[in-house]
């Protein structure tokens, strides 16, 4: 399988219902929080793919080859706090290089800010690892999903203070880890 075929395989494995247990380390305030999340992933229709492109003012190149998904999740923290969200996302491969497949990751709603957003992704076909990097107004989120097998994923979330333009990511605010198990 080439990189694009492995990318499709990765997401075919991700479609369905999942349960995750996560631990978040808030380094800026010295707190640790545990939570559990149930989420579902399903494919997007061509019409919804086009809407995600339009919401982000992204050039429409035809959506047939783009992988698009609807994500819905409900999270409960160990303190009993509940949060949920639904969003549509689209992955637009731009190039294949020595580090794998790279491209744009579009959402109709961002996690940190309630607006459409274009981020970047990199997919390593050897390790079946997807890294998504989103630059928000105040922070930069680096979210990594590693598919260990079709029913088990590892998740890592790193959130940095957004540095001045052109400067490296240095000030880490949050580190999160999760084990995600497929239910259906």
Curated annotation (Swiss-Prot):
Enzyme Commission number(s) of this protein: 4.-.-.-
Gene Ontology terms for molecular function: lyase activity
Pfam families recorded: CpeS
Superkingdom: Bacteria
Keywords: Lyase
Keyword Lyase: yes
Enzyme class: lyase
Family the UniProt entry places it in: Belongs to the CpcS/CpeS biliprotein lyase family.
Role summary: Covalently attaches a chromophore to Cys residue(s) of phycobiliproteins.
Name the record gives this protein: Chromophore lyase CpcS/CpeS 1
Provenance organism: Synechococcus sp. (strain JA-3-3Ab) (Cyanobacteria bacterium Yellowstone A-Prime)
């Amino acid at each position: 399988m080439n990189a694009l075929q492995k990318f499709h395989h990765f997401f075919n494995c991700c479609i369905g219902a999942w349960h995750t247990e996560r631990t978040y380390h808030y380094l800026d305030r010295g707190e640790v929080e545990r939570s559990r999340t149930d989420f579902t992933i399903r494919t997007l229709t061509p019409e919804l793919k086009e809407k995600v492109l339009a919401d982000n003012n992204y050039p429409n190149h035809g959506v047939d080859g783009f992988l698009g998904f609807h994500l819905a999740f409900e999270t409960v923290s160990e303190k009993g706090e509940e949060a949920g969200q639904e969003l549509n996302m689209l992955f637009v491969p731009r190039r294949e290089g020595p580090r794998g497949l790279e491209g744009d990751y579009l959402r109709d709603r961002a996690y940190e800010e309630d607006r459409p957003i274009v981020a970047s992704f990199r997919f390593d076909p050897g390790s079946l690892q997807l890294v998504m990097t989103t630059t928000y107004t105040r922070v930069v989120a680096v979210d990594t999903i590693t598919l260990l097998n079709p029913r088990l994923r590892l998740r890592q979330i790193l959130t940095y203070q957004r540095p001045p333009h052109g400067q490296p990511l240095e000030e880490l605010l949050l580190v999160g880890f999760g084990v995600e198990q497929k239910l259906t």
